[in-house]
Amino acid sequence: MLGHIKLMTVAPEIEAIRKVVALHEPNILVVDTTDEVHVDRFDGEIQRQNMVIGALKEMAQKHNIIVFAVHHVNKVSAAGNTISLHSLKGSTNIVQKADKVLMVKGKRDERARIICSEKSRDEGRFEMTCAFDFETMTFKELL
């Protein structure tokens, strides 16, 4: 049913992601999580993040695709369900480099989620409440 979706189930090198994008020419690339992408020769976490995000942005521009780079929130914010841009695990470096930041808020054991735009260079912010359907892999807006 979801044959149009291709999955890599191992933490890839950034070069492996480049090859997959060139081979399959996707419209959308989801990297979950940016922490798991391996890069060569880096000095510290900020430089590693710069290399990963820089490579993903380059692929987006070169191949005219949408890239979703997943970055998790810290445990304290997740446990208290008080998620904001300051809740991101580690450095806010990723937020600074992103064109848009979407946050998915909600409790792990509930189907309803709030999807909100926390940062956007081109458009205004939005927020909507959705339910996720695991069979169709889609969100349905709850009014």
Task: Give the location of each predicted region.
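Glycine-rich, phosphate-binding/catalytic loops in enzymes
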Residues: 46-48, 134
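Short glycine-enriched, charge-decorated loop/helix-capping segments at active-site entrances
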Residues: 43-45, 84-85
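Phosphate-binding/switch region of NTP-binding enzymes
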Residues: 54-143
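Conserved inter-motif catalytic segment of the P-loop NTP-binding fold
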Residues: 1-44, 51, 108-109
